[in-house]
Every structure is written in C-alpha cells, then in structure tokens.
Amino acid sequence: MKPQERFIKRGNIDICTENFGNAAHPAILLMMGATASMVWWDAEFCERLANRGFYVIRYDNRDTGKSTTYPSGESHYSTLDLADDVLAVMDGYDLPSAHLVGMSLGGMLAQLAAILYPERVNTITMIASGIWDDKSELPGIDPAVLEYHASAGDLDWEDEEKVIDYMVGGWRILNGSRHPFDEKRTRELAQTELKRDNNLLSMFNHSFLKGGEELYGRSDEIKAPALIIHGTEDKVLPFEHALALQKTIPHSKLVEIKGAGHEIHPLDWDLIVEAISAHAKDTVQDN
C-alpha cells in the first residue's frame, strides 16, 4: 500500500500529509509528538490500521518533515496553532469529523481539539501522553533523557552518521524492558527523517511551545470517547500521567502495556492497532 502525499495550505503554512487506504472509510488522523515527524508513525503501522477499514492520515507538525519550518531557535506559533492545524488537515481532506490518535504531545493536541471543536472529533486515543493541565504533583521526565538531549548542542549536525546515531540513541533511551530495542528499524526511520526534512534543527523549536494555558483543567469537559494507551516504564510521561488522564476524562478507557516505554514498539503494533480499531468501531456501533 503506497501512501499518497498531499500538502494542505493554511494561510502561509504548508502541512505535509500522507494517506493510506480507502477515502470512503472512517478517517483516523495520526498526530505525532514533539520534535518528531510523521515518519515515526511507521508506514506498516499505518497500513495495518487501514486494513482494519480506516482511511489513515499522518502528517508533519510544523517545524518537522516537509511542513513549514522556521529558523532554529525562534518561536512563531503556539500550541493552539498546532491544535488548529489538526482542523486544517481535516478541512483539507473534506472531513466533517475524524478519529484522532495522538502520541505524546499529539495526545495533548487531541485533547485540545476535542475541547474546542467537539463536533469534529469522533473519538480520541492518547498514546504515551498526559493531561492538558499543569499537574506539578505528577512525576516529571527522567533526568537521563534530559541529560542525553543536552548533548545535542555539541553535535556536528553536518555529519549525517553522527546525527543518525543521535536520533537512534534518543529512541533507545525511551525503550522499555518489554521488548529489545529495534535498532535496525529505528535507524532506517532516522535515515528517512534526515533525507526528507526541510530543516532538521527546526524540530527543537517545539521546546519553545506555549499557549493554551487557559484550557488547563478542562479535559474533564471532553465528550468524545477517550482511549488511553500507556507503557508502565514511560520515561517522559510516567504511568501516573495515564492514571491522571483516566481519572479526569469521563468514561475513558486505559490500556496498560506492562514494561513498555515512551514508544510504539513494532512488537506491540497488533495490540495497539486492535485497541484503536475496537475503540473507533465500538463508538460507531454505539451511535
């Protein structure tokens, strides 16, 4: 199944998307986390979802992949702008509504979209994500992850092999104990990322993201059926964040993946695809 590339215009912004499957099927929009392009929604993962009877769309957030990028170190948009980009993609595909599936930051964007535009959101699935709120009592990111990425400033970004090694290492440190780290596949995806990115360094602009604070504490207003998928060894958003999400969003369901990290490991694809598919289809049947 070869994905079809399509660029969506939103004012002076270009959003690069790819779609899999039959456009007549219910749409699933995949939203990746901070600093990562749509490449990290592995094409085979997308195909498996499409084979379940969905029209699957993945896209590059601003400052990643082939979408509009800005000079490194500058902030030109807010978190709410990224949430509105979700709607722009849906409008570009003439979708009145869609199932939203977000990884990490993508899961928070799904929450924002569900709060702001409830009529456009059929369901939300949040993978390795956290509640859109300032929950200082919840455990933070593992210091080892921060220490690893602090080395990015010393990296020779002109040396492609070193850059790929850095990207692979960044995913390795997020891997849980459930499965061995899939270095071969991760390296292939990193190579693809490097080849297709307009400006790789612009991904770090996501560290300047602000905006949407006025929506803190409103995730309990979400009416869309919500599914939470979270590993018990997540080093970015520890498992307590999943429990907080489940407690906050009414009638949400939690799929706990024991030993999984901040990742969508290939050996867990069947489990995750089944959970997303069942969640979306149950909602259609309920309606």
Where in the sequence are the language-model features?
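Conserved HGGG/HGGXW glycine-rich cap/lid loop of the alpha/beta-hydrolase fold
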Residues: 13-69
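Catalytic active-site module of serine/aspartate enzymes centered on a nucleophile-bearing elbow/loop
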Residues: 252-287
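Conserved alpha/beta-hydrolase "acid-adjacent" motif
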Residues: 235-241
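Short glycine-enriched nucleophile-adjacent loop
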Residues: 107-118, 124
